[in-house]
């Protein structure tokens, strides 16, 4: 399975593509979409949508994972971040892809094993997990972490679902 991880931002939106082959995680690509500060805000949202649409067309991911909004003391910043997330999610949905969302705590827990891990610890672990030649740009690194989190979570859901005994879906199928 190939996953596009997205770390949305109104100025910089990071993306990372990770593929799972058996138990191996393979780094496909990563990068960032830098919006032009001269554009008005709707123009920046269009840049995010267009950039991610291009990435989706080029790499053909199976699923998309997006980092969830953090709480901010600045309401205006939180609103803009939410709108950038919306542009990213719409790009994925427009391509017919399923979208999962994860908090920063969930991402750190999945990658490092500790929800309170420092950004540097996450980057170091990603470099090792994905055999990266160097640490990725900060936003791209966050996006790679979101993709890895989704692959780990998806694997856990499939594994636990297969371990759950089948339940009767109606009384006719009930067998004591």
Curated annotation (Swiss-Prot):
Its main location: cytoplasm. Mg(2+) 1 binds at residues 7, 139. Binds 2 Mg(2+) ion per subunit. GO terms for molecular function: crossover junction DNA endonuclease activity; DNA binding; magnesium ion binding. This is Crossover junction endodeoxyribonuclease RuvC. GO terms for cellular component: cytoplasm; Holliday junction resolvase complex. It comes from Pelobacter propionicus (strain DSM 2379 / NBRC 103807 / OttBd1). Mg(2+) 2 binds at residue 67. Its cofactor is Mg(2+). Homodimer which binds Holliday junction (HJ) DNA. The HJ becomes 2-fold symmetrical on binding to RuvC with unstacked arms; it has a different conformation from HJ DNA in complex with RuvA. In the full resolvosome a probable DNA-RuvA(4)-RuvB(12)-RuvC(2) complex forms which resolves the HJ. It is found in: Cytoplasm.
């Amino acid at each position: 399975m190939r996953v596009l991880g997205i770390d949305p931002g109104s100025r910089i939106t990071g993306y990372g593509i990770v593929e799972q082959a058996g138990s191996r995680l393979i780094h496909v690509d990563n990068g960032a979409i830098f919006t032009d500060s001269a554009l008005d805000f709707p123009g920046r949202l269009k840049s995010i949508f267009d950039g991610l649409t291009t990435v989706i067309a080029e790499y053909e991911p199976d699923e998309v994972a997006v980092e969830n909004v953090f709480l901010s003391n600045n309401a205006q910043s939180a609103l803009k971040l939410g709108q950038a997330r919306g542009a990213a999610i719409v790009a994925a949905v427009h391509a017919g892809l399923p979208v999962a969302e994860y908090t920063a705590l969930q991402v750190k827990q999945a990658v490092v094993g500790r929800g309170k891990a420092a950004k540097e610890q996450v980057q170091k672990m990603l470099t090792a997990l994905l055999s990266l030649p160097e640490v990725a740009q900060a936003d791209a690194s966050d996006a790679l972490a979101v993709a890895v989190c989704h692959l780990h979570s998806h694997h856990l859901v499939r594994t636990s679902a297969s371990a759950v005994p089948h339940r009767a879906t109606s009384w006719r199928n009930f067998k004591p």
